[in-house]
Curated annotation (Swiss-Prot):
UniProt lineage: Bacteria, Bacillati, Bacillota, Bacilli, Bacillales
Protein name (Swiss-Prot/TrEMBL): Beta-glucosidase
Organism of provenance: Niallia circulans
InterPro entries reported in the protein's UniProt record: Glyco_hydro_1, Glyco_hydro_1_AS, Glyco_hydro_1_beta-glucosidase, Glyco_hydro_1_N_CS, Glycoside_hydrolase_SF
GO annotation (BP), single: cellulose catabolic process
Molecular function (Gene Ontology), one example: beta-glucosidase activity
Entry-linked Pfam families: Glyco_hydro_1
Length: 450
């Protein structure tokens, strides 16, 4: 048996996102988001699912916070629905929406749980999309207005803030690959969006400092990790592009004030470049307090200039590893490698694992429980790598499992379950899974024994 220790002040938590759990999509003055529009469009989401009700967390604050308390987490990462507080994206404030988040945060604090707030987890107000969305600089100004509102409303209660969750998804998965809302397929638009997101991030960080908010602010890119099929220059560069596409492209401008040259050159060779205007890079390039690491899987890649290699000429091939039910290969060592790379490149900043978890669609057994041993095994092997990172001097301060409960899994609908808590979508009954009790034990002890 080996013991894997974590510091006594380690921030154990779980994570969710507004559109995936809240429901109440047209109640109490909430405006429409791009995900409402997308999910209501036939063929965009599997089974025609949508977030109209989701987990109904909007009406179940006390019940869900009690689950968090029972689990024993120190922090709860959630996101704010921008159209719930600013239905048109700017202008008139929806007080009922703000009151909901005050109730949630107050309930968390009353139960000894720190709120860890994400400002933007993909649910752009549709009113702003109608004006060009993140492809327009109008949305940068709108985001600054929204961020200032939330800092003033909740800055005295929330000490940790994330500006954007997984900007690669918002830029490229949503506007180049077309898989997520708003469903565009335009590479230049995706590059424009990625730049505008970073400028908006810079605006929010500036406001956070100017308002004197006490706490930390950072960003959570979906930093992928690709390993080369062969140790050739071509395959290693193919992996560098995959990692740079989702990670370095967002973190380099923040930390170094410029985009990574290898990615700029790649885009320019294809005929594309980001829409930089005077002052943008200076605004983006300012200190943040932490980086959020979202990690689920790795890929093995090789150079392929053909169709299979895609825009990056980088083809993902199977590692031959076991897969979760969503089809993602399991490679826990990739989490360590990603933490090591991020620490080494960016000066060993404070890191939080802001998402890590597994999709397994285990149902209720005859005994009324959900025996999700595969999820327990997945979490254990990744926590071992997190512990290893801490032992090796990486400044990792917390771990937030994805997710507290089964929820609306974006374009996959409700068919893919990531939760520690099972949700019956017909009755909305919550049932903690075996992994819930296992994770509760890890949190209470502060160590793993395997």
């Amino acid at each position: 048996m080996s013991i894997h220790m974590f510091p006594s002040d380690f921030k154990w938590g779980v994570a969710t996102a507004a559109y995936q759990i809240e429901g109440a999509y047209n109640e109490d003055g909430r405006g429409m988001s791009i995900w409402d529009t997308f999910a209501h469009t036939p063929g965009k989401v599997k089974n025609g699912d949508n977030g109209n009700v989701a987990c109904d967390s909007y009406h179940r604050v006390e019940e869900d916070v009690q689950l968090l308390k029972d689990l024993g987490v120190k922090v709860y990462r959630f996101s704010i629905s921008w159209p719930r507080v600013l239905p048109q994206g700017t202008g008139e404030v929806n007080r009922a929406g703000l009151d909901y988040y005050h109730r949630l945060v107050d309930e968390l604090l009353a139960n000894g749980i720190e709120p860890f707030c994400t400002l933007y987890h993909w649910d752009l107000p549709q009113a702003l999309q109608d004006q060009g969305g993140w492809g327009s600089r109008i949305t940068i100004d709108a985001f600054a207005e929204y961020a200032e509102l939330m800092f003033k409303e909740l800055g005295g209660k929330i000490k940790q803030w994330i500006t954007f969750n997984e900007p690669w998804c918002m830029a490229f998965l949503s506007n180049y690959l077309g898989v997520h809302a708003p469903g565009n397929k335009d590479l230049q638009l995706a590059i424009d969006v990625s730049h505008h997101l970073l400028v908006a991030h810079g605006r929010a960080v500036t406001l956070f400092r100017e308002l004197g908010i006490s706490g930390e602010i950072g960003i959570a890119p979906n930093t992928s990790w690709a390993v080369p099929y062969r140790r050739t220059k071509e395959d290693m560069e193919a992996c560098l592009r995959v990692n740079g596409w989702s990670g370095d492209w967002y973190l380099d401008p923040i930390y170094f004030g410029e985009y990574p040259k290898f990615m700029l050159d790649w885009y320019e060779n294809l005929g594309y470049k980001p829409p930089i205007v005077d002052g943008d890079m200076e605004l983006i390039h300012q200190p943040i307090d932490f980086i959020g690491i979202n990690y689920y899987t790795s890929s093995m890649n090789r150079y392929n200039p053909g169709e299979a290699g895609g825009m990056l000429s980088s083809e993902a091939i199977s590692m031959g590893a076991p897969k979760t039910d969503i089809g993602w290969e399991i490679y826990a060592e990739g989490l360590y490698d990603l933490l090591r790379y991020t620490a080494d490149k960016y000066g060993n900043p404070t890191l939080y694992i802001t998402e890590n978890g597994a999709c397994y669609n285990d149902g209720l057994s005859l005994d009324g429980r959900i025996h999700d041993q595969r999820r327990i095994d997945y979490l254990a092997m990744h926590l071992i790598q997190a512990s290893r990172a801490i032992e090796d001097g990486i400044n990792l301060k917390g771990y937030m499992e994805w997710s507290l409960m089964d929820n609306f899994e974006w374009a996959e609908g409700y068919g893919m379950r990531f939760g520690l808590v099972h949700v019956d979508y017909d009755t909305l009954v919550r049932t903690p899974k075996d992994s819930f009790y296992w994770y509760k034990g890890v949190i209470s002890r502060g160590w793993l024994d395997l």
